[in-house]
Amino acid sequence: LPSDATPVLDVTGKELDSRLSYRIISTFWGALGGDVYLGKSPNSDAPCANGIFRYNSDVGPSGTPVRFIGSSSHFGQGIFENELLNIQFAISTSKLCVSYTIWKVGDYDASLGTMLLETGGTIGQADSSWFKIVKSSQLGYNLLYCPVTSSSDDQFCSKVGVVHQNGKRRLALVNENPLDVLFQEV
């Protein structure tokens, strides 16, 4: 990480800590709000919940807590903007479902015209599981999917946003309107 690395902050202004769990919450309230949660993917034959969704409103259930696992763990416990990282749902689970907690980008969904976020990723490997947190041009932060392991400035990253799937808001790769989020310690 460069010496001018900027730490990611939670809603109270504290730096994110890889040892703690956070809810990914919306920067908006009411019908535009809603926390991120782990749920069952439509038409999935996976034995465990494997879809990454956002509730339809901020009134109601809280989201599923996550941990951020930075690729630069030798820099301490902080999580920094533009750092390659893995995202893992921080939940108790059966042995069968352990691999269904780590975020990744799934295959292209032709009916929705995009790639959906799901679980089943691998921590620390150069597959479909690398993400970044960047400052939003609006309020809060955006999540990016960054499939290349290099941290060069010309790295190709895609924005994470929301698409509608069977009446639910599913996290997916988008060209416009990335999801603006904040992080709330659990």
From Swiss-Prot:
It is found in: Vacuole. Probably synthesized as a single-chain precursor which is cleaved to form chain A and chain B. Disulfide bonds join C48-C97, C146-C157. Induction: By infection with Phytophthora infestans. The keyword Disulfide bond applies. Its main location: other. GO terms for cellular component: vacuole. Keywords: Disulfide bond, Protease inhibitor, Serine protease inhibitor, Vacuole. The record marks R67, F68 as: Reactive bond for trypsin. The record marks M115, L116 as: Reactive bond for chymotrypsin or HLE. InterPro entries: Kunitz_inhibitor_STI-like_sf, Prot_inh_Kunz-lg. Tubers. GO terms for molecular function: serine-type endopeptidase inhibitor activity. The keyword Transport does not apply. Potent inhibitor of serine proteases (chymotrypsin and trypsin). Inhibits tightly human leukocyte elastase (HLE). Does not inhibit papain, pepsin nor cathepsin D (cysteine and aspartic proteases). Protects the plant by inhibiting proteases of invading organisms, decreasing both hyphal growth and zoospores germination of Phytophthora infestans. Heterodimer of chains A and B; disulfide-linked. Double-headed inhibitor able to form triple complexes with target proteases, by binding simultaneously one molecule of trypsin and one molecule of chymotrypsin. Belongs to the protease inhibitor I3 (leguminous Kunitz-type inhibitor) family. The serine protease inhibitor PSPI-21 comprises two protein species with pI 5.2 and 6.3, denoted as PSPI-21-5.2 and PSPI-21-6.3. They may be encoded by two alleles at the same gene locus. This is Serine protease inhibitor 2.
